[in-house]
């Protein structure tokens, strides 16, 4: 009892006792079981026997899992009651307040990291309560790409602060998870006022002048640009002084071992800034010595950037002026640069130099920028910069390189010079098919030939043979130049389409049917040989889904056929079998225009000719004549946007000529090299589905549309 009184919180899960003792000690039972039965209602239904039964189940003797030492505090002897107990195995109590605090911290961290990401700081792997080194989103760690940004996240995730320790950047700011963004602007620096005497500059000694002489820089140029020197211990370094309107604002030092450093807390400007104050043409180079080299070639209107080039072009948008710390020198010199109508960028020819050129052009406007291409040093190598050209080839070649500067490339804007090689190849006909490929019929070749990369729209009244004529022409193209084709023919079953193509290829009917007349059908051997040809020449595009295919779906499969099989032609037959879902506010005319633009881009990009079959609308008062292209159902864009427009019309009037006569009306030819407007007549062989030149050219009436104003 004394043991129980001392440890009232312990639950005895393994208790060895005598039931008789328990039954005989009513007070003991009431004392032990009071906490367990406190929740039961005091009702007669809960009898004493039921209580004892419950107690016996709870205090059922259980063998100990391991011996318990007699010295253990859990081993006690009482009057007539011997008991021992192992360490209780109960779950650790969960502190709900601690768990709630953890959830709050995690929620803050999610919010905080999202806000940091908006500032360009990736803090996904930065734990709270520690300082983490990251790439600065503003200066990107300079040329070396060092992790110069120190980020600290509060242990409770409530806030974060950052600071870039690079002197040229100084980005500093902070953000709170539950509040606004603290200032992330660069630290406001107080610009130092410096003088030649104050920073202890002195005239150049003979040794430094000899160094410049070896680099083809004259003493006169050094004096005009006020190049000086400074003694640091036992070493002499070159001092490039930065002046603005006669005031010394900064100084950059260069050791003979090519180590650079600048005066701290000074204004960053272009080197030689006063030389471009009254000029409309500016040359920008990458180093101070290159600026001096330009002067030796006769160009005084030249400036140099004060810092090294970046490793690569930034993929981010140009930041605002107050945040563009890496290129602050351009903003500081904007009053000078905005007057220039022509800016020649002559940075180094290596990767970082070209990246610097791109960053400068992005900020100053590419439309007024030109770029310099340095001359060749050898068969496989170009000179790197202006001073290297001056030292190796002299001032005349350097001047020539600057005068030959080319307009800076602008996406989507070209000069014809960019295409001279292509024009020469077109003139020499080195690519092939410049005149177009023969259709296989002499009567038609004078009017229409197949040019890679063009779109031909084919129309005609139903059952006039549009698909038959296209299939026959594809067979001719394969036989003559070996072209392959993708067929999106949605009105034909695959087996029927295969039969038609095999008949045209083998020149025999597929079946012993009435249409074959007395011509013997193709043999099994001929069929098997034709199947191989069929498999090597044509690639069906079939939509096996319940829905109709869209034009995007068809062009994606056609692109795959170009890359996988090398097709040179695509047939889309017909237009009205495609899925033409469009936005509620889009008219059919707008949709057709957009669709034809997609087809033409595919055709031109992959140098693949596309035949697009479009049915005419219902003809009113049709007199048996051929329709025209404006009769195509849907939009006038079918004729406006296509390169070639063709009408296929079959004669059904015995008085007008033979019934096997087919009129091929060429109604539009954009490329005069490929053909001209006119009519050609072919004879159709119903047995094999093939066409041949007709010896007669009868006049067949053409349906006229009302005059359009």
Curated annotation (Swiss-Prot):
Residues 280-385 form the Toprim domain. Mg(2+) 1 binds at residues 286, 348. Residues 1-16 form a transit peptide. Its EC number is 3.6.4.12, 2.7.7.-. ATP binds at residues 460-467. Residues 430-698 form the SF4 helicase domain. InterPro entries: DNA_helicase_DnaB-like_C, P-loop_NTPase, TOPRIM_DnaG/twinkle, TOPRIM_dom, Twinkle-like. Expressed in young leaves and shoot apex tissues. Detected in developing tissues such as cotyledons, sepals, pistils and inflorescences. Nearly undetectable in mature leaves. Its cofactor is Mg(2+). It is found in: Plastid, Chloroplast; Mitochondrion. SMART domains: TOPRIM. Keywords: ATP-binding, Chloroplast, DNA replication, DNA-binding, Helicase, Hydrolase, Magnesium, Metal-binding, Mitochondrion, Nucleotide-binding, Nucleotidyltransferase, Plastid, Primosome, Transferase, Transit peptide. PANTHER family: T7-LIKE MITOCHONDRIAL DNA HELICASE, TWINKLE MTDNA HELICASE. Has both DNA primase and DNA helicase activities and may be involved in organelle DNA replication. Capable of producing RNA primers of 9 to 18 bases from a single-stranded DNA template. This is Twinkle homolog protein, chloroplastic/mitochondrial. It comes from Arabidopsis thaliana (Mouse-ear cress). The lineage of its organism: Eukaryota, Viridiplantae, Streptophyta, Embryophyta, Tracheophyta.
């Amino acid at each position: 009892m004394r043991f129980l009184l001392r440890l009232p919180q312990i639950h005895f899960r393994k208790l060895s006792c005598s039931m008789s003792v328990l039954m005989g000690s009513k007070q003991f039972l009431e004392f032990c079981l009071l906490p367990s039965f406190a929740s039961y209602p005091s009702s007669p239904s809960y009898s004493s026997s039921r209580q004892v039964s419950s107690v016996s189940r709870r205090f059922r003797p259980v063998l100990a899992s391991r011996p318990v030492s007699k010295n253990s505090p859990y081993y006690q002897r009482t009057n007539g009651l011997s008991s021992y107990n192992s360490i209780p195995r109960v779950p650790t109590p969960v502190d709900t307040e601690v768990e709630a605090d953890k959830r709050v911290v995690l929620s803050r961290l999610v919010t905080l990291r999202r806000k940091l990401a908006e500032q360009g700081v990736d803090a996904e792997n930065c734990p709270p309560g520690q300082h983490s080194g990251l790439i600065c989103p503003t200066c990107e760690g300079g040329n070396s790409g060092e992790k110069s940004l120190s980020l600290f996240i509060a242990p409770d995730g409530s806030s974060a602060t950052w600071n870039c320790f690079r002197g040229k950047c100084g980005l500093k700011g902070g953000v709170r998870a539950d509040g606004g963004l603290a200032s992330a602007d660069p630290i406001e620096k107080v610009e130092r006022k410096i003088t030649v005497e104050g920073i202890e500059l002195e005239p150049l000694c003979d040794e430094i002048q000899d160094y410049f002489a070896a680099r083809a820089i004259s003493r006169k140029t050094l004096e005009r640009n006020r190049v000086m020197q400074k003694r640091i211990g036992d070493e002499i370094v070159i001092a490039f002084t930065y002046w603005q309107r006669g005031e010394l604002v900064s100084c950059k030092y260069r050791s003979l071992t090519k180590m650079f450093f600048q005066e701290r807390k000074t204004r960053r400007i272009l080197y030689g800034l006063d030389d471009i104050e009254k000029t409309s043409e500016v040359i920008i180079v990458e180093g101070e010595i290159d600026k001096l080299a330009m002067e030796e070639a006769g160009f005084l209107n030249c400036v140099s950037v004060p810092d090294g080039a970046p490793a690569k072009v930034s993929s981010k948008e140009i930041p605002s002026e107050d945040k563009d710390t890496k290129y602050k020198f351009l903003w500081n010199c904007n009053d000078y640069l905005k007057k220039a109508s022509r800016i020649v960028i002559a940075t180094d020819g290596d990767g970082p130099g070209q990246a610097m050129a791109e960053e400068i052009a992005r900020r100053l406007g590419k439309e007024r920028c030109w770029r310099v291409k340095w001359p060749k040093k050898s068969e496989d190598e170009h000179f790197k910069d202006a001073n290297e050209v001056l030292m190796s080839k002299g001032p005349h070649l350097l001047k020539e390189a600057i005068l030959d500067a080319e307009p800076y490339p602008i996406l989507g804007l070209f000069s014809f010079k960019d295409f001279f090689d292509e024009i020469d190849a077109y003139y020499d006909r080195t690519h092939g098919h410049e005149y177009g490929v023969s259709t296989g019929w002499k009567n038609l070749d004078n009017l229409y030939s197949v040019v890679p990369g063009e779109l031909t729209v084919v129309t005609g009244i139903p059952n006039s043979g549009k698909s038959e004529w296209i299939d026959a022409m594809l067979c001719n193209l394969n036989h003559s130049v070996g072209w392959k084709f993708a067929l999106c023919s949605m009105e034909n079953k695959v087996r029927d389409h295969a039969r038609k193509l095999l008949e045209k290829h083998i020149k025999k009917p597929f079946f012993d049917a009435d249409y074959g007349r007395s011509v013997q059908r193709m043999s099994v051997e001929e069929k098997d040989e034709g199947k191989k040809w069929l498999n090597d020449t044509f690639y069906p595009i079939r939509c096996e889904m319940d829905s109709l295919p869209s034009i995007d779906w068809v062009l994606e499969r056609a692109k795959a056929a170009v890359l996988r099989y090398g097709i040179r032609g695509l047939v889309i037959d017909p237009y009205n079998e495609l899925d033409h879902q469009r936005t509620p506010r889009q008219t059919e005319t707008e949709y057709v225009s957009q669709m034809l633009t997609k087809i033409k881009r595919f055709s031109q990009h992959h140098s693949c000719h596309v035949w697009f079959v479009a049915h005419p609308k219902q003809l009113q008062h049709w007199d048996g004549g051929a329709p025209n292209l404006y009769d195509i159902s849907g939009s006038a864009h079918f004729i406006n946007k296509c390169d070639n427009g063709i009408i296929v019309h079959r004669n059904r009037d015995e008085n007008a000529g033979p019934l096997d006569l087919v009129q091929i009306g060429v109604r539009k030819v954009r490329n005069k090299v490929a053909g001209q407007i006119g009519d050609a007549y072919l004879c159709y062989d119903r047995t094999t589905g093939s066409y041949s030149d007709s010896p007669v050219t009868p006049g067949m009436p053409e349906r006229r549309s009302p005059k359009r104003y």
